[in-house]
């Protein structure tokens, strides 16, 4: 029987690591933007708070501000890891996770840029102890609609691949069931952030490693195309001069089934 074909390489591992290394460099002076990371960490802590359960051994991936690890109570060991070794213990989400089994694995803002999402979820489940919990959040379908429209306006009748494909709640739910998590829960939520310009938005995204890490990123916008994109973005400004961009988040949680009997 032929083995399954490898997943398509939509994202560049090198570009992804470079983006996170750039974020780590910007974070050294403590002033870098981290809006998305803080929102994801705060929501994850809120969700775990409702469980009324302590987790002894925890792996948290992508906690770039450290706010999740700092806010989690009752754990004996918390390991912070990241694809970029400057942000934690280095790991590759598409390879077996080191150091398990864990009672809790949390992934923040990363699964939207792995090439093999089902494989990454399966590897997390395998790294869990029986009755261990996986919780993951990442930017999903519907994120950055104004920027997407502005980029299309800039490209005109020759659109280029500039924005990542995105996972929606329904597809994520199907993946959780396929991978074998027990009692899977998948939901979407979001928040808005105001920006003065397209340039500010792009700069903030790059500072948070949310820039273009596609394997085929397309050519840069030319001068005229960039002007069209900036104007299209500015046209969405409110009376206060800010454009409120939307960030939609997909959150997944599920348990590693305990053995029967």
Question: Positions of the model-derived regions?
Answer:
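A short SAM/SAH-binding and catalytic strip from SAM-dependent methyltransferases
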Residues: 102-118, 122, 138
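A short glycine-rich, Lys/Arg-flanked "PGG" loop and its adjoining helix->strand segment in the class I
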Residues: 118-133
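Conserved Class I S-adenosyl-L-methionine
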Residues: 29, 33, 189-261
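Adenosine-cofactor binding site in Rossmann-like domains, unifying the SAM/SAH pocket
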Residues: 79-96
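A short acidic, Gly/Pro-enriched loop at the edge of an enzyme's catalytic core
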Residues: 93-105
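Conserved alpha-helix/loop element of class I SAM-dependent methyltransferases that forms part
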Residues: 35-57, 67-70
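N-terminal, positively charged/glycine-rich alpha-helical extensions of SAM-dependent methyltransferases
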Residues: 1-42
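Conserved catalytic/acceptor-binding region of the Class I
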Residues: 135-198, 211-219
